[in-house]
């Protein structure tokens, strides 16, 4: 086989390119965390991007959908964080169809044609679509469906974070296979069957009916994506080890290393070229055709960037320099393409990879801080765990960036920028540099916390998880006196003894279920017949009655408060007070909810009541308290999928430009509680950049030590 070489590097996306697809030799699709998807068009040898911003949040996957109509160029499908799939006809500038139905992020897609499209989601289901209509909902996985494949007109394959592969005929499950030792990340069709890859670092080949054939080993970390190269009968794979690998049978023919941390997606063009998307925001094309190979100076620059790529010492383990070989080891050939060795060069440690094609070792990076964990480094008379060299401009000496593993990276970044009189707008970039060079994955380790793991492992801190907070304070005599005053104005008043019974019960704080049922009827009668401005005391009474409700009564209280939230707009003054009181009541109901149906209703209430900047302080506090109590319930019930959904609501609330300190503190308590689950913490970090947001809030309220402590505790969870 002629080896693949770089053809083009296409820049334009501002964040990770999570998905790529082949449309034709001249058209490529891409999806990015920057919230856009793009169609790249080759015109006169140059690639021109057409970016589209039709999603809310990041875009996670993209695939080409051939059209049945021969007059159409087909569609590009994109799916992402907003739970929506979009079909856009190639060559047009607006969506043709919106695909609604998934209850969480859409993370995978595959299509035979516009009548047979399959999507996978964090909601643990796959859906099959004909244009904009859902034909089937494939249920059975216990976690995110990260891989889908339309194998035939009604034959579908799904792979999940639950480690299973399932084969479907229509919506009927045909076979379930415990396929891998970790999350299944991608599927691709091969002659006579399909291939799968996983976080376990292994690629497996299967017949179309799910019989195992053989497996491929070579990747040193998670394998994210697969594609079949039809005109050469090869498989290409990519992953967290920065490589694309080319396979023929059981043999790895070539290993291409990229100057980036992760290669997320790979796809093959009809002419055999490969396109990939990576964590540095680039789309790259590799080719075996000498006509399409990049100019020599471009290739040289690419190889130089690969060789200078900084590899965290944690990525390769705690290296002892004295035990490493010197350059003499490079005189011995590698055993297989892609083999990696660590070499001691003076005071440095360099990584080299064996190239079968060129029959030589090629430098693929320099290990940063490749020393034992106990060593400290001096900078301006102080000891630090790390002192990095940071290049800020060509021709200038690198600047020193000191950092201790125990400190907040944002503090280190701010100190570095202020010391060197650099703009604070670079803070996020410096933090990413620190995190990349101090938080690596081991080349020998295949484990990554997946976003939908059912593990109940939690991290404990001195604050989290917090306890649920109830709204239990009330001036019962004043509340009931107000009820009597209003009741006396009614043409059809309540019996006086009903309000007397309510006052006695609330004052005693020991109420039987029978009494609560009777008092419920009194309060519900008020809600049904009194105006919004008059219902406040009744809602307040219901809030108190909801505390310590039995399993029989809790759903009733939940339904009552939910009805108020859904039926009353929160824009007017009286309206917003009604909703605020209902949110307080819901907060008191949460400790007595034990099922997923109740959780779903609580989530609906939160979603529909996210406060505006102009919302009253009490409204914001009630909302944040409900979110905090719900976060604790989700952890108790191990509902991690819903926990990840709650993150979206929390970060929307935390974006308030006119925050209230108590409300924000309770929202931070909710966030910290959720992030005691590593999978949710990973989602908070990767999707919402939680560290930056938490740091900004702590700075805003830096005069309050509780925010400083909360920041420290939350950041320790990532």
UniProtKB/Swiss-Prot annotation:
Phylogenetic placement of the source organism: Eukaryota, Fungi, Dikarya, Ascomycota, Taphrinomycotina
Gene Ontology MF annotations: ubiquitin binding
Compartment(s): Nucleus; Cytoplasm
Main location: nucleus
PANTHER family hit by this protein: PHOSPHOLIPASE A-2-ACTIVATING PROTEIN
GO CC field: cytoplasm; nucleus
Primary gene name: lub1
Assembly with partners or alone: Interacts with cdc48.
Record keywords: Cytoplasm, Nucleus, Repeat, Ubl conjugation pathway, WD repeat
WD repeats: 12-50, 54-98, 101-139, 140-178, 180-217, 218-257, 259-296
Function field: Acts as a negative regulator of vacuole-dependent ubiquitin degradation.
Entry's Gene Ontology BP terms: DNA repair; proteasome-mediated ubiquitin-dependent protein catabolic process; ubiquitin recycling
Record-annotated PUL domain positions: 462-717
Name of the molecule in the record: Ubiquitin homeostasis protein lub1
Keyword Lyase in record: no
């Amino acid at each position: 086989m002629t080896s693949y070489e770089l053809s083009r590097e296409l820049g334009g996306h501002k964040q990770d390119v999570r998905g790529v697809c082949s449309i034709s030799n001249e058209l490529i699709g891409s999806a990015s965390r920057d919230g856009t998807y793009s169609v790249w068009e080759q015109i006169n040898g140059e690639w021109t991007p057409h970016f589209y911003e039709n999603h809310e949040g990041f875009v996670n996957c993209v695939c080409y959908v051939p059209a049945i109509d021969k007059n159409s160029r087909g569609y590009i499908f994109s799916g992402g964080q907003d739970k929506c799939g979009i079909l856009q006809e190639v060559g047009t500038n607006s969506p043709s169809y919106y695909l609604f139905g998934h209850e969480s992020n859409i993370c995978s897609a595959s299509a035979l044609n516009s009548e047979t499209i399959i999507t996978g989601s964090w909601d643990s289901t796959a859906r099959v679509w004909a244009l904009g209509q859902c034909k089937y909902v494939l249920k059975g996985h216990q976690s995110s469906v990260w891989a889908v494949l339309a194998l035939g007109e009604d034959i579908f394959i799904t792979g999940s974070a639950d480690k299973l592969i399932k084969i479907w005929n229509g919506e009927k499950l045909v076979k379930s296979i415990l396929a891998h030792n970790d999350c299944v990340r991608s599927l691709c069709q091969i002659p006579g069957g399909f291939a799968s890859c996983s976080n376990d670092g292994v690629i497996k080949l299967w017949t179309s009916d799910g019989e195992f054939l053989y497996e491929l080993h070579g990747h040193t970390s998670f394998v994210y994506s697969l594609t079949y190269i039809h005109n050469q009968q090869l498989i290409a794979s990519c992953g967290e080890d920065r490589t694309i690998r080319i396979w023929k049978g059981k043999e790895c023919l070539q290993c291409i290393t990229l100057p980036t941390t992760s290669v997320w997606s790979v796809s093959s063009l009809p002419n055999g070229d490969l396109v990939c998307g990576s964590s540095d925001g680039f789309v790259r094309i590799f080719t075996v055709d000498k006509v399409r190979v990049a100019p020599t100076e471009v290739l040289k620059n690419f190889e130089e960037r690969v060789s200078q790529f900084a590899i965290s010492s944690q990525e390769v383990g705690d290296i002892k320099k004295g035990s490493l070989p010197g350059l003499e080891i490079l005189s011995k050939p590698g055993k297989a393409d892609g083999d990696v060795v660590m070499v001691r060069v003076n005071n440095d440690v360099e990584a080299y990879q064996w190239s079968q094609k060129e029959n030589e070792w090629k430098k693929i990076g320099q290990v940063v801080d490749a020393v034992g964990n106990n060593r400290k480094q001096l900078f301006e008379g102080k000891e630090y765990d790390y002192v990095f060299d940071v290049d800020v401009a060509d021709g200038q000496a690198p600047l020193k960036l000191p950092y201790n593993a125990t400190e907040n990276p944002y503090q280190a970044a701010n100190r570095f920028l202020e010391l060197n009189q650099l703009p604070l707008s670079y803070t996020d970039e410096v933090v990413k540099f620190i995190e990349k060079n101090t938080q690596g994955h081991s080349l020998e380790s295949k484990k990554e916390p997946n976003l939908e793991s059912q593990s109940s492992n939690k991290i404990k801190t001195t604050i989290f998880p917090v306890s649920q907070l109830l709204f239990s304070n009330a001036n019962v005599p004043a509340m009931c006196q107000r009820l009597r005053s209003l009741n006396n104005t009614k043409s059809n008043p309540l019996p006086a003894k009903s309000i007397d019974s309510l006052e006695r019960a609330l004052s005693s704080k020991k109420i039987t279920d029978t009494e609560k049922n009777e008092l419920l009827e009194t309060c519900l009668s008020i809600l049904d017949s009194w105006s919004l401005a008059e219902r406040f005391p009744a809602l307040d009474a219901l809030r108190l009655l909801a505390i310590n409700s039995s399993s029989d009564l809790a759903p009733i209280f939940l339904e009552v408060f939910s009805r108020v939230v859904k039926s009353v707009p929160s824009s007017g003054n009286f309206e917003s007070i009604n909703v605020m009181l209902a949110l307080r009541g819901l907060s008191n109901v949460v400790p007595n909810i034990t099922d997923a149906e109740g959780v779903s209703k609580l989530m609906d209430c939160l979603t529909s009541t996210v406060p505006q900047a102009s919302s009253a302080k009490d409204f914001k506090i009630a909302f944040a308290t409900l979110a905090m109590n719900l976060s604790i319930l989700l952890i108790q019930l191990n509902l991690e999928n819903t926990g990840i959904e709650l993150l979206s609501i929390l970060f929307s609330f935390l974006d308030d430009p006119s925050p209230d300190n108590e409300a924000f503190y309770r929202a931070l308590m909710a966030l910290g509680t959720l992030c005691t689950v590593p999978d949710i913490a990973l989602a908070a970090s990767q999707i919402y950049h939680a560290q930056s947001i938490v740091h900004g809030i702590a700075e805003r309220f830096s005069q309050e030590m509780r925010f400083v402590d909360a920041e420290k505790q939350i950041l320790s969870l990532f």
